[in-house]
């Protein structure tokens, strides 16, 4: 089964300093048909005004990934983690038995544009932890790079779930493949740009879910510039 999630169908929330697009139900946006996909619970595309952000708030038992597209995102948490996340970097905070954190635009002049991703962990009430990793764009040009994986065994950040988060950057006519296993779930999210996925045209914010599907997923870059694409390989 292939599930389509067009960008235009996502939830949309706007406040004075925040504009968010929600792939799945979150906060003020609720749709019982879109509560998540396997352990993938949240993909929020956020734009935060200069100098603004999320004051200290608490999370527990969630793997939280932040992926910055433009600008800088300043993070502080009660586990001792903190810093500024820039484009090309991924931040991981495992909330464990409970952690308080804040996120603010690191600039007083320019907005920050980022994805926040939540994955439910495979264990509960572990100790909170934090890490941040930079990824060379050249390693993703026309190829998959592992950005996060189960306890870091396959590379990338060491999330607490039997999952892999992969990324690629595709110029026009560049092709990457991924083998689908019917015993796994897959969620494909176009961060920016244009691609075709097994012949289906997709643009920024569009997503496809794959359940009980086997065979080859082939992505082809389209349009100008490079498309930025994430793939989540998840337990069923």
PLM features per residue range, with description:
Residues 1-236:
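Jelly-roll (double-stranded beta-helix
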């Amino acid at each position: 089964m292939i599930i389509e999630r067009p960008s235009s169908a996502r939830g949309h929330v706007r406040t004075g300093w925040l504009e968010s697009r929600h792939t799945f139900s979150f906060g003020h946006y609720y749709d019982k048909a879109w509560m998540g996909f396997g352990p993938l619970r949240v993909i929020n595309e956020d734009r935060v005004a200069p100098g603004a952000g999320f004051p200290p708030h608490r999370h527990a038992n969630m793997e939280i990934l932040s992926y910055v597209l433009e600008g800088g995102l300043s993070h502080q948490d009660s586990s001792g983690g903190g810093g500024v996340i820039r484009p090309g970097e991924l931040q991981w905070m495992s909330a464990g038995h409970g952690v308080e954190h804040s996120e603010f635009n690191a600039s007083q002049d320019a907005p920050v544009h980022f994805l926040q991703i939540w994955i439910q962990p495979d264990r509960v009430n572990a100790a909170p932890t934090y890490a941040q990793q930079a990824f060379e764009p050249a390693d993703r040009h026309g190829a998959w790079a592992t950005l996060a994986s189960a306890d870091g065994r396959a590379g990338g950040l060491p999330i607490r779930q039997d999952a892999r988060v992969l990324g690629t950057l595709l110029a026009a006519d560049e092709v990457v493949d991924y083998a689908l296993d019917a015993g796994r779930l897959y969620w494909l999210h176009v961060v920016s740009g244009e691609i075709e996925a097994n012949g289906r045209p997709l643009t920024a914010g569009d997503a496809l879910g794959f359940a009980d599907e086997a065979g080859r997923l082939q992505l082809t870059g389209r349009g100008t510039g490079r498309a930025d694409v994430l793939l989540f390989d998840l337990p069923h």
